[in-house]
Amino acid sequence: MQENVKAPKRSKKAEQRAETIEQILDAAEYLFSKHGLYGVTLKDVAKKVGVHHTLLNYYFEDKNKLFHAVFARRAVVTSERRMNALDQYEKACGDRPTVEGALRAFLDTDLDLYIEGGEAWKNYAALGAQVANTPEWGAELMDTHFDPVVLRLIDLLKKALPDCSEEDIFWGYQFVTGALMLTLARTGRIDKLSHGLCKSDDFVAVKERMASFMAAGFLQICGQGR
């Protein structure tokens, strides 16, 4: 009979270190989401956390590595969740995926994080929108963290639209991600244009509409909505 082996407890010092790193990442995420990579210094982050800036150099070496760590922390979560959702959707629908079904697995799963995850996830959403719209250095980060899940979506869309050209499917995805990034940026523009009828941080309203709207666009450009 096997005895239950308990995992060794982390030392208090290790716990404090992990907690400090999380505080640094949270503070950096907030500041980067508001001011961008070039509008924030390590001293700014250190001041918000209440530590000396040399501690940030010790843990992350420089600002770029801190930024990459901030971005990667939640990128892993959203990428894995969407990949699992796409896998589960394909398993459930067999050989008959629909455009809207694939888009809901991809988009709704991501939007749920911003609906349920509080302000921290909304900060990450704004940060992601910045990264996606900064080709000089953001494209590489997006490629590294999100290409696998995006290509998984593309694969399902090809199965849902077997007569659609690859060109139209990739353009369709371009329009999807453009709308998603603008939504994640929460610029407040729709608030002003609609005189308060719509709120840019109302991710529930976005979730109710985005996948079906984008699915109709795919069907149209692929000749099935004409």
Language model features: what each stretch is:
Residues M1-A7, E116, D147-R226:
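C-terminal peripheral helix-coil segments that are non-catalytic and often amphipathic
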Residues L66-D87:
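Histidine- and aromatic-rich ligand-binding microenvironments
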Residues R17, I21-E29:
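Short, leucine-enriched amphipathic alpha-helices that occur as contiguous helical runs
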Residues Q23, L31-R73:
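Helix-turn-helix
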Residues F106, D110, A125-A132, V176, ...:
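Short alpha-helical scaffolding segments that buttress acidic/His motifs in well-ordered protein cores
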Residues M83-K122, Y173:
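Hydrophobic alpha-helical connector segments
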Residues L25, S79, E100-L107, Y173, ...:
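Short, amphipathic alpha-helical "lid/cap" segments that border enzyme active or binding sites
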Residues G101, A105, E116-T144, T187-K192:
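Amphipathic alpha-helical segments used for helix-helix packing
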